[in-house]
UniProtKB/Swiss-Prot annotation:
Sumoylated. Belongs to the vinculin/alpha-catenin family. It is a peripheral membrane protein. Monomer and homodimer; the monomer preferentially binds to CTNNB1 and the homodimer to actin. Component of an cadherin:catenin adhesion complex composed of at least of CDH26, beta-catenin/CTNNB1, alpha-catenin/CTNNA1 and p120 catenin/CTNND1. Possible component of an E-cadherin/ catenin adhesion complex together with E-cadherin/CDH1 and beta-catenin/CTNNB1 or gamma-catenin/JUP; the complex is located to adherens junctions. The stable association of CTNNA1 is controversial as CTNNA1 was shown not to bind to F-actin when assembled in the complex. Residues 864-894 are annotated as: Disordered. This is Catenin alpha-1. The keyword Cell membrane applies. One of its GO terms (cellular component) is cytosol.
Length: 906
C-alpha cells in the first residue's frame, strides 16, 4: 500500500491491487470478459477426430475481442490526456493494454487457425489473462483518478471549514461561509455519485452518513463561530464550536475512507453491521440444536450448546435487571430462561438415546420442537421487555429539553446545570433503549439506522447543553436565543429520526400489547390518586396517559400508511379517530375537573364514577385499536398471548375445562343428558344462550376489578364458575358427572352466597346513603332466594327408558329449571357487585376506610382476562387479501441521515 500526499491529500492506493471496488468498473469490464471467455471456451472439449481446418467461429470471436480492445484503448487515451491526476500511470496503463492486446491478437489468430492445438490454446489463455489484467488495471486507475478529483475537492472543503472556525471577525466569517457553501454543495454532488458506484454496502452507508453530518453541521458551525465572536467571554460557545468542528473533521475522514473503500478508524462505523446480538445468538442456537443422530457426540455437542445457551441467558438477565423492566416481566423472563435450560437438558437426553441411529425418533423430534418453542417464548418475553422500555422512554421526549430551555431563559445557571444532568440522563436512556431494541431485532438494515441515529443523538447532546449554558449566561441576547432555537430544532428532529427508526425494528403488535398494559397501570394510578386526593400525582399520571395515547395514534397511523386503503385501514383509522376525537377530550375534561375540584379550598365534591368511566374508555379505546390492527393477522402470526382458540361452545373463562368422556348410556347422568333428542337439546341450548347473556354481564363486571383484596369479586367468580359447570352438565359436558355432583355444587353456591350476604350486609350497615343501602340489601335478598331455588332444581333426575325399542331420555324440564335458576342467580350477583361498589364509594367519601374494621374490599381496576382478539376464519369463507401499497417505503438505511439540506441562510 502506498499513500500519496500530494498537496496534503491522503490518497491511499496499492498499485499492485486489482480489487474492483465500484460497479462502474464491473460494468465496463463485463463485455470484454464475456467475449474472451467465449473465445477461450471454443472447442474446449479437446482433440477431435474431425478434419483439421480453420474455425470461422474462432476467427469471428477473435475479431470481436480485438475490436473491444481497440475501444478500450481509444477511451483510455482520451482519459489519460484529459486527466489532471495520475497522468503518467494512466499513459503507462494504456500502453500496457495496447501491448497485451497485440499479443492477444497474435495468439487468438494462431488458435483460430488451429483450434484443436492444446499448446496454442494455452498460449491464448495466458494472453487473455494478461489482457484482462491490463484492462482491469487501466479501469481501476481511471476510477482512482476520479477518487483523487473528489479528494481534492474534499481538501478544499476541509480547508474552508478550518478557515470558518478560525475567522477573526464577523466580516471575515461571513466571507468564509459564503465561499464555503458552494464548495460543500459541489462536494456533496461528487460524493453522492461516488456513493452510488461503491460495491460495498458498508462503504455506501458510511459515505451517506458522513455526507449528512457535513451538510447539517456546516451551517451550525457558522452560527457557533458567530456566537463565539460576539460573546468571547462565554466558554460554552467555544466548547460548542469545537465539538461541531470535531464532528465535521470526522465527516471529512469518513468521506475520504468511503470514497477509497478503505476501513474506517471510527469504531462506531463497525457496530452498524448485522442484526442484534441476542437475536443472532438465538437464531444460531436454533440452528445448532438440529444434529444428525449418527454424528452426535455428547462430549462435543453438550458443552458447546450449554455454553451458547448460558451466553444467551446472560444477555436476557441483563435486560431483565434493567430499571424499566416491570417486575412481572422480569419474573417471566427468569421463568422462560429456566424453561429453556430444562428443555435443552431434555433434548440432550433424547440425542443420547438416539445416538448412532440413522433417523430421529418421534420423541427426539418432539424434544426439538419443544426446544424451539421455548426459545420462541423467551424471544417473545424479551421483545415485550424491550417494548416496556420503548413505551416508557420514548414518551414526552421533549419535556427534559423544554425544562432545560426554560431555566436557561431565566438566566439561572445553577438550575441549568441541574436540569442539564436530567437532560443528559434522558438522552442516555434513549440511546440505551435504542441499543436494547437493536439487540433483539433481526432487521439488519433497521438496526444499522437505529445505531447511526443514536450515535448522532449522542454527539448532539453536549451541544444542546452548551447552548443552554450560553443562553443562561446571556439570556437577553437575541443571538443566544436563536442559537438555542437552532439546537432545539436539531434535537427534536434527531429524536424523531431515532423514534421512527426504533419503531421500524420493533413489532407494532408488541408495542400495542405493552401500551395497553401500561395504560391500564396508569388508569389505576389515576383512580388511586383521585381517591387519595393527590393532585400532583393525578395530573402527572393523566399526562402520561395522554402521551401514551398520542404515541399509539401516531404509530398506528404511520403503520396504516404502508397499506393500500381499504376496509382494514378504514376500521383501524376509525378506531384511532374515536380515541383522539371523542375519548381523549372527555378524559381530559374529567381530569381538569378533578384537578380543579381537588385544588379548591375547601375541596369540591367530584363524581368518581364519571372519572372512572372516562378512564376506562381510554383503556377500551387502546384495546379496540389493537383489535383492529390484529384483524388481518393469521393465527400463526399471533403470539399465544394474543390469540386463544375459540371453542364452538361458549364456556366460562373461570370454569375448569375438561374433555368429554365417552358417552355410554347408563354410565352417568351427564352421559345421559348428552343423549337427549335434538329437539330437547335445542330447548336446552336456547336456555343456555339466555344464561350466557347474563354470564357475559357478570364477566364484564368482575373483569373490571382486581380480586386481590376484594372478597366480593372472589365470591362472584367462584359462583360464576360453579354455575357454568352446572349448565355444562345439562348439555352432557363439564366436570359434573352425576346428580350428586350437581347437588354438591349447589351447596357450594349456597355457601358462597351466604358469605357474600354477610359481607354485603356489613358494607350496607356502614353505608351513609340510605338509597344505596336499601338497593344492596334488596339484591342480597335475591341471592338468598335464588340460591334456595338452585338447590331445589339441582336434584336433576336423568333417566333412560326403553319404550317400544326406542331410548327415551327424561329430565329436560328439571334441566331447564336448573338453567333458569342459575340465570336468575347470575343476574342477582351482577347487581350485588355493582351495588357493593357504589355503597363502598359512598362510605369512603363520608368517613374514610381506615376507621372501619371491615374485611379488605379494595376496588382496584384490573384488565379483563384475555379474550380471543381475532376469530378464526372458516375454511370456506373467502378472505380478502390486504396488499401492501406499491409505494411502501423501502428506505435506504441511512437515507434519512443523508437528506439533511444545508440552510440557505442563517
Amino acid at each position: 500500500m502506498t499513500a500519496v500526499h500530494a498537496g496534503n491529500i491522503n490518497f491511499k492506493w496499492d498499485p499492485k491491487s486489482l480489487e474492483i471496488r465500484t460497479l462502474a468498473v464491473e460494468r465496463l469490464l463485463e463485455p470484454l470478459v464475456t467475449q474472451v471467455t467465449t473465445l477461450v471456451n471454443t472447442n474446449s472439449k479437446g482433440p477431435s477426430n474431425k478434419k483439421r481446418g480453420r474455425s470461422k467461429k474462432a476467427h469471428v470471436l477473435a475479431a470481436s475481442v480485438e475490436q473491444a480492445t481497440e475501444n478500450f484503448l481509444e477511451k483510455g487515451d482520451k482519459i489519460a490526456k484529459e486527466s489532471q491526476f495520475l497522468k503518467e500511470e494512466l499513459v503507462a496503463a494504456v500502453e500496457d493494454v495496447r501491448k497485451q492486446g497485440d499479443l492477444m491478437k497474435a495468439a487468438a489468430g494462431e488458435f483460430a487457425d488451429d483450434p484443436c492445438s492444446s499448446v496454442k490454446r494455452g498460449n491464448m489463455v495466458r494472453a487473455a489473462r494478461a489482457l484482462l489484467s491490463a484492462v482491469t488495471r487501466l479501469l481501476i486507475l481511471a476510477d482512482m483518478a476520479d477518487v483523487y478529483k473528489l479528494l481534492v475537492q474534499l481538501k478544499v472543503v476541509e480547508d474552508g471549514i478550518l478557515k470558518l472556525r478560525n475567522a477573526g471577525n464577523e466580516q471575515d466569517l461571513g466571507i468564509q461561509y459564503k465561499a464555503l457553501k458552494p464548495e460543500v454543495d459541489k462536494l456533496n454532488i461528487m460524493a453522492a455519485k461516488r456513493q452510488q458506484e461503491l460495491k460495498d454496502v458498508g462503504h455506501r452507508d458510511q459515505m451517506a452518513a458522513a455526507r449528512g453530518i457535513l451538510q447539517k453541521n456546516v451551517p451550525i458551525l457558522y452560527t457557533a463561530s458567530q456566537a463565539c465572536l460576539q460573546h468571547p467571554d462565554v466558554a460554552a460557545y467555544k466548547a460548542n464550536r469545537d465539538l461541531i468542528y470535531k464532528q465535521l473533521q470526522q465527516a471529512v475522514t469518513g468521506i475520504s475512507n468511503a470514497a477509497q473503500a478503505t476501513a474506517s478508524d471510527d469504531a462506531s462505523q463497525h457496530q452498524g453491521g448485522g442484526g442484534g446480538e441476542l437475536a443472532y445468538a438465538l437464531n444460531n442456537f436454533d440452528k445448532q440444536i438440529i444434529v444428525d443422530p449418527l454424528s452426535f457426540s455428547e462430549e462435543r455437542f453438550r458443552p458447546s450448546l450449554e455454553e451458547r445457551l448460558e451466553s444467551i441467558i446472560s444477555g436476557a438477565a441483563l435486560m431483565a435487571d434493567s430499571s424499566c423492566t416491570r417486575d412481572d416481566r422480569r419474573e417471566r423472563i427468569v421463568a422462560e430462561c429456566n424453561a429453556v435450560r430444562q428443555a435443552l437438558q431434555d433434548l440432550l437426553s433424547e440425542y443420547m438415546g438416539n445416538a448412532g441411529r440413522k433417523e430421529r425418533s418421534d420423541a427426539l423430534n418432539s424434544a426439538i420442537d419443544k426446544m424451539t418453542k421455548k426459545t420462541r417464548d423467551l424471544r417473545r418475553q424479551l421483545r415485550k421487555a424491550v417494548m416496556d422500555h420503548v413505551s416508557d422512554s420514548f414518551l414526552e421526549t421533549n419535556v427534559p429539553l423544554l425544562v432545560l430551555i426554560e431555566a436557561a431563559k431565566n438566566g439561572n445557571e445553577k438550575e441549568v446545570k441541574e436540569y442539564a444532568q436530567v437532560f443528559r440522563e434522558h438522552a442516555n436512556k434513549l440511546i440505551e433503549v435504542a441499543n436494547l431494541a437493536c439487540s433483539i431485532s433481526n432487521n439488519e438494515e433497521g438496526v444499522k439506522l437505529v445505531r447511526m441515529s443514536a450515535s448522532q443523538l449522542e454527539a448532539l447532546c453536549p451541544q444542546v447543553i452548551n447552548a443552554a449554558l450560553a443562553l443562561a449566561a446571556k439570556p437577553q441576547s437575541k443571538l443566544a436565543q436563536e442559537n438555542m432555537d437552532l439546537f432545539k430544532e436539531q434535537w427534536e428532529k434527531q429524536v424523531r429520526v431515532l423514534t421512527d427508526a426504533v419503531d421500524d425494528i420493533t413489532s407494532i403488535d408488541d408495542f400495542l400489547a405493552v401500551s395497553e398494559n401500561h395504560i391500564l397501570e396508569d388508569v389505576n394510578k389515576c383512580v388511586i390518586a383521585l381517591q387519595e386526593k393527590d393532585v400532583d400525582g393525578l395530573d402527572r399520571t393523566a399526562g402520561a396517559i395522554r402521551g401514551r395515547a398520542a404515541r399509539v395514534i401516531h404509530v398506528v397511523t404511520s403503520e396504516m400508511d404502508n397499506y393500500e386503503p381499504g376496509v382494514y385501514t378504514e376500521k383501524v383509522l376509525e378506531a384511532t379517530k374515536l380515541l383522539s376525537n371523542t375519548v381523549m377530550p372527555r378524559f381530559t375534561e374529567q381530569v381538569e375537573a378533578a384537578v380543579e375540584a381537588l385544588s379548591s379550598d375547601p375541596a369540591q365534591p367530584m363524581d368518581e364514577n364519571e372519572f372512572i368511566d372516562a378512564s376506562r374508555l381510554v383503556y377500551d379505546g387502546i384495546r379496540d385499536i389493537r383489535k383492529a390492527v390484529l384483524m388481518i393477522r393469521t393465527p400463526e402470526e399471533l403470539d399465544d398471548s394474543d390469540f386463544e382458540t375459540e371453542d364452538f361452545d361458549v364456556r366460562s373463562r373461570t370454569s375448569v375445562q375438561t374433555e368429554d368422556d365417552q358417552l355410554i348410556a347408563g354410565q352417568s347422568a351427564r352421559a345421559i343428558m348428552a343423549q337427549l333428542p335434538q329437539e330437547q337439546k335445542a330447548k336446552i341450548a336456547e336456555q343456555v344462550a339466555s344464561f350466557q347473556e347474563e354470564k357475559s354481564k357478570l364477566d364484564a363486571e368482575v373483569s373490571k376489578w382486581d380480586d386481590s383484596g376484594n372478597d366480593i369479586i372472589v365470591l362472584a367468580k367462584q359462583m360464576c364458575m360453579i354455575m357454568m359447570e352446572m349448565t355444562d352438565f345439562t348439555r352432557g359436558k363439564g366436570p359434573l358427572k352425576n346428580t350428586s355432583d350437581v347437588i354438591s355444587a349447589a351447596k357450594k353456591i349456597a355457601e358462597a352466597g351466604s358469605r357474600m350476604d354477610k359481607l354485603g350486609r356489613t358494607i350496607a350497615d356502614h353505608c351513609p346513603d340510605s338509597a344505596c343501602k336499601q338497593d344492596l340489601l334488596a339484591y342480597l335478598q335475591r341471592i338468598a332466594l335464588y340460591c334456595h331455588q338452585l338447590n331445589i332444581c339441582s336434584k336433576v333426575k336423568a333417566e333412560v327408558q326403553n319404550l317400544g325399542g326406542e331410548l327415551v331420555v327424561s329430565g329436560v324440564d328439571s334441566a331447564m329449571s336448573l338453567i333458569q335458576a342459575a340465570k336468575n342467580l347470575m343476574n342477582a350477583v351482577v347487581q350485588t357487585v355493582k351495588a357493593s361498589y357504589v355503597a363502598s364509594t359512598k362510605y369512603q367519601k363520608s368517613q374514610g376506610m381506615a376507621s372501619l374494621n371491615l374485611p379488605a374490599v379494595s376496588w382496584k381496576m384490573k384488565a379483563p382476562e384475555k379474550k380471543p382478539l381475532v376469530k378464526r376464519e372458516k375454511q370456506d369463507e373467502t378472505q380478502t387479501k390486504i396488499k401492501r401499497a406499491s409505494q411502501k417505503k423501502h428506505v435506504n438505511p441511512v437515507q434519512a441521515l443523508s437528506e439533511f439540506k444545508a440552510m440557505d441562510s442563517i
